[in-house]
């Protein structure tokens, strides 16, 4: 849901620009209080009851809309542990945290520029060698289960390349 959307044009029930800003403010407060944030180790998947999860060897969530992913991620919130789609600024921080991993990026003064994220798990048009038993044929393509592509794991986080084009809150 873009931040600049008119309150009357929102597709998520009860969504307003104010609620969007409040979510971001709450994130900033949590990061300050906790000294950081966590990111799920495995891609978002759903169990047999269609409940969202982040577990290895599961059917990953694909071909979904921003709105569905937003709602799905929220469903993982339990107690004081919150779950939400990652914000762009969090994505950027993950990439910076991984900057020393197989990179060819640029540092200018105190600024850091990611000029090629393929070394950080972003693999457009990349061939990944994997055995037949690790996949399920889906038409003319193969569907990987969560955590299957070990070569796409960096700092123990699997496949930042994306199954939902890495939707972010923005």
Model regions and ranges:
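Short aromatic-cysteine micro-motif
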Residues: 2-160
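Short beta->alpha transition motifs characteristic of CBS
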Residues: 149, 167-170
């Amino acid at each position: 849901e873009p931040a600049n959307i008119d309150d009357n044009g929102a597709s998520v029930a009860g969504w307003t620009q104010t609620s969007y800003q409040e979510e971001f403010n709450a994130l900033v407060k949590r990061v300050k209080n906790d000294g950081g944030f966590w990111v799920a180790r495995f891609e978002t998947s759903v169990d047999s009851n269609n409940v969202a999860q982040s577990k290895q060897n599961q059917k990953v969530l694909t071909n979904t809309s921003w709105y569905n992913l937003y709602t799905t991620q929220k469903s993982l919130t339990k107690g004081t542990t919150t779950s939400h789609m990652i914000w762009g600024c969090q994505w950027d921080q993950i990439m910076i945290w991984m900057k020393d991993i197989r990179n060819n990026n640029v540092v200018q003064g105190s600024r850091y520029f990611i000029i090629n994220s393929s070394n950080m798990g972003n693999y457009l048009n990349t061939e990944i060698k994997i055995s037949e038993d690790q996949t399920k044929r889906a038409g003319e393509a193969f569907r990987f289960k969560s955590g299957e592509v070990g070569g796409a794991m960096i700092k123990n986080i699997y496949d930042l390349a994306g199954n939902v084009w890495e939707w972010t809150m923005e």
